């Protein structure tokens, strides 16, 4: 697929999802398409991975499975992120955690890493810390949207501070692992995906603030 066309398609896809999920006539349809969007985005990241190899795909697979397993333990124990449970919106679940969650962690790590690489920051630890900061900032936007659309729900009224601390540490570990491979790149496609994630959830957050 032509890279320019693909970028435009992703922009239209996320814009349509943002608007469609808030229109009464289309909300149910577009909300049901969330898992497909996550699968498609992960597929694009794999197909257009800048340095494709068996080792690269093995690493990405391990990353996705490790992230999914972390969430399994988080849901099971309530000790990592806080007490929460997943709804039905994100699709098929294994051990009470959607398969798409591991894919989403994968997408967010490689996408936010591409932003960090573009900024030419020295040192793997510094890059990992900034990448984790970007992912945690994104989680601040995701949380109210996730609860509204039944991605997941928390046992309490407020999202626990523990969640954001754990998000940063988990993201830092995944970013640092990624930094210690030859795979990080300044992929413009991955940077676009990162930007779309921020804009998508910022848009949802604004819609919810104004009760749209």
Where do the model's predicted regions map?
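Aromatic-rich, lipid-facing transmembrane alpha helices and their immediate juxtamembrane interface loops
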Residues: 1-212
